[in-house]
């Protein structure tokens, strides 16, 4: 059984493979430095096994962003502004320095977060009975896609052979504002969904792990929106994955999951404290 913390198990898993899709999960342990170490393990294992094409699921790097006021954002205890981005971004170096033939895949936000329990923008019913998506994004656009379509784009990259090796490929189905997300979910559910655009300070004060990091992420998305969206190539994404679903198509296909998630959120909210 492969373990991201143990290089030898990864080497055994990669043995004889032509390609390897490599990804880590920050939210399993909430440690950016551990995620970077796991990336190094994946890169070393791919090198040892002689993988011909690795796809490394990376992320943007908050170190490349400077606020319009020149201010630093609040940092996590280990010095990261957006740890769930930065640990992956710093992992890029392992693949390049080891000479692993790698495509650096930059996937957009998963729309599945809309029905993921505990996600900041899970669709939930408010005290007034109205469904809402709550985000500190103002009118900023956010590249997004369904998780399954990320896999299909990766398959397209493997099929392309060496064409994208050594390049960073940002994939997304479309870029949507919070209001557009709410409208698509509303259409799928046949019920009004409101977009609550909240200030960043509300998120920073929220009682969930990594609240500062989530607020930092949305601050970057909002303040550098054109540059942020520019990392994602919608036309290339569709050429890699001709079945790529639009937001409306994804919402319609996931109507039941959205309904189940909302029901669970309602029950949790109604539990006595």
Question: Where in this protein do the model-derived segments appear?
Answer:
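Short, basic/glycine-rich phosphate-binding loops at helix/coil junctions
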Residues: 20-21, 231
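Oxidoreductase cofactor-interface core, primarily capturing Rossmann-like NAD(P)-dependent enzymes
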Residues: 5-15, 22-37, 44-55, 59-194, ...
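Short, charged low-complexity linear motifs
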Residues: 42, 91, 96-97, 230-240
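NAD(P)-dinucleotide binding in Rossmann-like oxidoreductases
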Residues: 196-198
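Cofactor-binding loops of NAD(P)H-dependent oxidoreductases
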Residues: 1-2
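A hydrophobic C-terminal alpha-helical subdomain
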Residues: 164, 200-273
């Amino acid at each position: 059984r492969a373990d991201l913390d143990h290089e030898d198990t990864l080497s055994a898993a990669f043995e004889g493979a032509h390609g390897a899709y490599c990804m880590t999960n920050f939210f399993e342990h909430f440690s950016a430095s551990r995620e970077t170490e796991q990336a190094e393990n994946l890169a070393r294992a791919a090198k040892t096994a002689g993988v011909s094409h690795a796809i490394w699921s990376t992320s943007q790097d908050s170190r490349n962003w400077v606020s319009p006021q020149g201010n630093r954002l609040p940092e996590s205890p280990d010095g990261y502004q957006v740890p769930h981005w930065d640990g992956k971004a710093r992992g890029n170096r392992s693949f390049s320095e080891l000479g692993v033939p790698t495509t650096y895949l930059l996937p957009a936000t998963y729309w599945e977060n809309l029905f993921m329990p505990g996600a900041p923008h899970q669709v939930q019913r408010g005290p007034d009975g109205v469904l809402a998506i709550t985000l500190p994004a103002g009118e900023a656009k956010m590249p997004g896609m369904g998780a399954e379509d990320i896999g299909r784009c990766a398959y397209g990259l493997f099929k392309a052979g060496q064409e994208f090796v050594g390049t960073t490929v940002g994939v997304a189905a479309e870029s949507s504002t919070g209001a557009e997300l709410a409208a698509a979910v509303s259409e799928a559910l046949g019920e009004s969904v409101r977009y609550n655009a909240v200030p960043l300070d509300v998120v920073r004060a929220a009682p969930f792990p990594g609240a500062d990091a989530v607020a930092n992420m949305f601050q970057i998305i909002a303040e550098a929106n054109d540059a942020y969206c520019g990392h994602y190539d919608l036309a290339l994404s569709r050429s890699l994955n001709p079945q790529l679903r639009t937001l409306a198509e994804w919402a319609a296909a996931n109507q039941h999951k959205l309904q189940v998630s909302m029901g669970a959120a309602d029950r949790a909210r109604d539990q006595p404290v």
